[in-house]
Amino acid sequence: IIIDGTENFSTRYLTNDAAVILGKPYIYGSIFRFEGQVSVFLSKPFNGFDRGPCYRCLFPAPPPPGAVPSCAEGGVLGVLPGIIGALQTAEAIKLIVGISEPLIGKMMLIDTLRMEFRTVKIQRNPNCPVCGENPTIQELIDYEEFCGLRRGEVSESDDIFISPHELKAKLDAREPIMLLDVREPR
């Protein structure tokens, strides 16, 4: 079972395609600001559960680079990763034990501002290039290129971080640096 907590589109497509190729359940979780999503993508029957759509059935193509802000740029309600992670864990337990109804063919949408949880149905795409009737993607591809990034390129939404130890080393070496502190004043 693959449980995904990434916020990087190229990694999500890689994870999905690997899960489909290997026949593994893929438990997807996504967060942004006050909202989250959870689903179970299952390309082959597993422990008594029928197959359902994959991530590409729902999102056939990634958004253009920089079109979707990162969690660091848009912010995230502090408890939301824990909520989504707990729901993903519950889905994993249901798959392992073979009980209840996992979110196969469904996506749970969480809005913590309104404190609303709703579930929507999602369909398998028979023309999906990975899990469809005649798949055209049967091995892993260059996901950075697929998502519009050149190999090794940092997208506009990626953040550059430096640890306190790295900063001290640069200051001690008198390297010319520019440090911008974007923390909120207290």
Identify the function of each model-found stretch:
Residues 1-84, 97, 114-116, 121-126, ...:
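E1/E1-like adenylate-forming module used to activate ubiquitin-like modifiers
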Residues 5-8, 92, 182:
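Generic detector of well-ordered alpha-helical packing
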Residues 17, 94, 186:
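Surface-exposed charge patches
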Residues 25, 34-36, 103, 173-176:
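Short, basic and Ser/Thr-rich N-terminal targeting/leader segments
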Residues 85-103:
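Internal hydrophobic alpha-helix adjacent to the cofactor/substrate pocket in enzyme cavities
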Residues 104-115:
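Intrinsically disordered, low-complexity Ser/Thr-enriched
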Residues 114-186:
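Flexible, polar/low-complexity N-terminal or interdomain linker segments that lie immediately upstream
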